Amino acid sequence: MEQNHQNLQSQFFIEHILQILPHRYPMLLIDRVVELEANKKIVAYKNITFNEDVFNGHFPDKPIFPGVLIVEGMAQTGGFLAFTSLWGFDPEIAKTKIVYFMTIDKVKFRIPVTPGDRLEYHLEVLKHKGMIWQVGGTAQVDGKVVAEAELKAMIAERD
């Protein structure tokens, strides 16, 4: 049953994120949610380390975190916002749902992300109707925009 969770906690640690999102290593791209306002906005981050497997090939002599993974991190953050806005922190319901991204628009990459960076995802709800959510925002390092995008997603039953 869809609900509106305005009094949701605003911070979630990795143990909470793992109970809501289905992603796992190496594709879980959120370490912590530091701000969440249901139906409105979310701020989360991932610490980028030299130990990321992706740096073995992108690029061995000049490691740059791939832009597509930045967008995926934004998508996961938006999915976390949509789910918790509808059902709050409910791991049992999370086992029955999955977020599918439908469109990714207006993507721009501005500054490379490298090991040692704390990659922050700042997203806000642009609109939503039922299980369809549109979010937009930026990825930032040290307050500087490194990427931006708009994403549309659908929450579906997990089969």
Swiss-Prot record:
Keywords: Cytoplasm, Lipid A biosynthesis, Lipid biosynthesis, Lipid metabolism, Lyase. It catalyses: a (3R)-hydroxyacyl-[ACP] = a (2E)-enoyl-[ACP] + H2O. GO terms for cellular component: cytoplasm; membrane. It is found in: Cytoplasm. One of its GO terms (molecular function) is (3R)-hydroxyacyl-[acyl-carrier-protein] dehydratase activity. Its EC number is 4.2.1.59. It comes from the Bacteria. The keyword Amino-acid biosynthesis does not apply. PANTHER family: 3-HYDROXYACYL-[ACYL-CARRIER-PROTEIN] DEHYDRATASE. HAMAP family: FabZ (MF_00406). This is 3-hydroxyacyl-[acyl-carrier-protein] dehydratase FabZ. The lineage of its organism: Bacteria, Pseudomonadati, Campylobacterota, Epsilonproteobacteria, Campylobacterales.
